[in-house]
Amino acid sequence: MKTLLTLGLLLLSVTAQAKVYERCEFARTLKRNGMAGYYGVSLADWVCLAQHESNYNTRATNYNRGDQSTDYGIFQINSRYWCNDGKTPRAVNACGINCSALLQDDITAAIQCAKRVVRDPQGIRAWVAWRAHCQNRDLSQYIRNCGV
């Protein structure tokens, strides 16, 4: 009985963990989902962005005290403008989704919302991490040896 309980707890802890993508796995997933060159944003830009926003972690969150918003998921999409978490004052929800959808191992919803973000006039510049770590840099290392 004790072994069964231990096994059950182990399985529960495994299912509660985030998926952390490997760099090339993430690049290939983005390519399969039409992100290569989407609105002029290269795969290397997306991979660099996710590296610096979430370290490729699907369940990453970051609370922003200033405006009481939270950044969600592998792309750290903000609840002030893009998703609804039921907690952020004056949220816009431009992606029309619940923020919890951005924390799934299946990143389809996160990709769709990221596409919506780059269609906005700011484009990829909406992400502070992209401006700080990726803009005007050689990003070839982010997709090197990935076969994309």
Swiss-Prot record:
Quaternary structure (record): Monomer.
Cellular compartments per GO CC: extracellular region
Keyword Secreted: yes
Keywords: Antimicrobial, Bacteriolytic enzyme, Disulfide bond, Glycosidase, Hydrolase, Milk protein, Secreted, Signal
GO molecular function, one term: lysozyme activity
GO BP terms, alphabetized: defense response to bacterium; defense response to Gram-negative bacterium; defense response to Gram-positive bacterium; killing of cells of another organism
Protein name: Lysozyme C-2
Domain C-type lysozyme: start-end pairs: 19-148
Null allele phenotype: Mice display increased inflammation in response to M.luteus infection, impaired digestion of M.luteus cell walls, decreased clearance of P.aeruginosa from infected airways, increased susceptibility to K.pneumoniae infection and increased bacterial burden and mortality following infection with various Gram-negative bacteria. Lyz2 is non-immunogenic in wild-type mice but is rendered immunogenic in mutants.
Main location: secreted
Paired cysteines (S-S): 24-146, 48-134, 83-99, 95-113
pH dependence: Optimum pH is 5.
Cellular compartments annotated: Secreted
Keyword Chaperone carried by entry: no
Gene3D superfamilies: 1.10.530.10
The protein's role, per its UniProt record: Lysozymes have primarily a bacteriolytic function; those in tissues and body fluids are associated with the monocyte-macrophage system and enhance the activity of immunoagents. Lyz2 is active against a range of Gram-positive and Gram-negative bacteria. More effective than Lyz1 in killing Gram-negative bacteria. Lyz1 and Lyz2 are equally effective in killing Gram-positive bacteria.
Similarity comment: Belongs to the glycosyl hydrolase 22 family.
Membrane spanning residue stretches: none
